Design a protein with these regions (language model features):
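Accessible peptide chain termini
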Residues: 1-2, 59
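Sec-dependent signal peptide recognition
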Residues: 2-9
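Hydrophobic h-region of N-terminal signal peptides that target proteins for export
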Residues: 10-19
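Sequence signature of WD/YWTD-type beta-propeller architectures
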Residues: 20-352
């Protein structure tokens, strides 16, 4: 079967899946979030490349934000004021890596509707860029350290030691903290918090964690964690979505499911909902077509999908839903602003 045939089948199955009548609870959730802004996410286009797409939070009004068949686009993030957009642009032949995506290709800055896109630096430069709260700077992460860069000029303003941080850096909404994945604290793949002024670090959660992001209050984080001791998946277990206070004093399950790894947790701007992806494959499977996304109310958590006998024994009070099923994608980002939909999807190659 050719790649085009596979993609055609994929789009048909996705469409058929969305056409299934949802339960009344899921239908109410969909109606509740339908008008709450837009979600940007990367996904395979019908041409086989990765483009950026927009959709309403209920999955409706899906449209292309970029149409660049000679490139792949990944890792989009709206600025906190929703006026700007950052993403990585890769060569069409380069597979998106679930672990290296923040340092692949070149960084692109654009208006939130995709217009006036401009390449910042060369390939591999400005890795793991994350917007400052005011959109005037972004923080980057490399072997040289955590650097704070002027968003207009590209000038490095200051640099802090990276303290074991190595990927998935995100600046807090209040500007005081950074969260990221660190090989520190006596183990690997920890979630850690860094003081953005002093560079001091502390662990939020340790061992087999990834894809951290902030709640709007900057006091809590959402992240993926594979708790040790699981017997399923041949003893390897499954990655689950958790939340914790940023000081690392408490944590709780948000969503999990035996049979799918849950990644890319992103909390809505009002702190009431969370987006995520669920994939049988590790890292959300960006090498192929990503994975189905989901949306739930945080107040409904914890939720456990499917039979998941082992998980339900550990979390007897967990619910089974509702979870709104969304199209396949990867690393989504949500804004309540209407700005992203102001332009039609005619984005062309970014300028240098």
């Amino acid at each position: 079967m050719t790649m085009r045939s596979v993609l055609t089948l994929f789009f048909l199955l996705t469409t058929l899946g969305r056409a299934t009548d949802p339960s009344p609870e899921v239908a109410r959730l969909a109606a509740e979030v339908r008008g709450k802004g837009w979600i940007v996410f990367p996904a395979r286009s019908e041409q086989g490349d990765w483009d950026l797409f927009l959709m309403r939070p209920d999955g409706s009004q899906r449209r292309a934000l970029t149409r660049t068949p000679e490139w792949n686009e990944a890792a989009p993030q709206f600025s906190r004021d929703s006026t700007r957009l950052l993403y990585r642009r890769l060569k069409r032949g380069e597979a998106i890596s679930g672990n290296r995506y923040g340092e692949q290709g070149a960084l692109v800055a654009a208006n939130s509707d995709g217009t006036d896109a401009r390449v910042l630096g060369s390939e591999g430069e400005l890795p793991w860029a994350s917007w400052s709260p005011n959109g005037r700077e972004f923080a980057t992460l490399s072997l040289k350290g955590v650097s704070f860069v002027d968003a207009e000029t590209g000038k490095v303003l200051r640099t802090l030691p990276r303290q074991g941080f190595f990927q998935q850096l995100t600046w807090s909404p209040d500007g005081q903290w950074l969260i990221g994945v660190a090989n520190a604290f006596g183990t690997g793949w920890s979630i850690a918090r860094m003081d953005a002024a002093k560079g001091e670090v502390s662990a939020v959660n340790t061992v087999d964690c990834c894809t951290p992001d902030w709640f709007p209050d900057s006091r809590q984080v959402i992240f993926s964690w594979r708790p040790p001791g699981q017997k399923t998946n041949r003893g390897s277990g499954w990655t689950q979505l958790w939340r914790a206070d940023a000081a690392g004093k408490s944590r709780s399950l948000v969503y999990g499911e035996d049979g799918r790894h849950v990644y890319g947790g992103h909390v809505s701007p009002d702190g009431r909902y969370v987006l995520f992806t669920g994939s049988v494959e590790e890292d959300g499977d960006p090498r192929h077509a990503g994975a189905p996304m989901g949306l739930m109310r945080l107040i409904d958590g914890p939720i456990i999908g499917g039979e998941s006998t082992e998980m339900r024994a550990l979390h007897p009070g967990a619910k089974s839903g509702p979870v709104l099923a969304l199209p396949a994608g990867w690393e989504p980002c949500w804004t309540f602003s209407e700005s992203p939909a102001c332009a039609t999807a005619t984005t062309i190659n970014p300028k240098r």
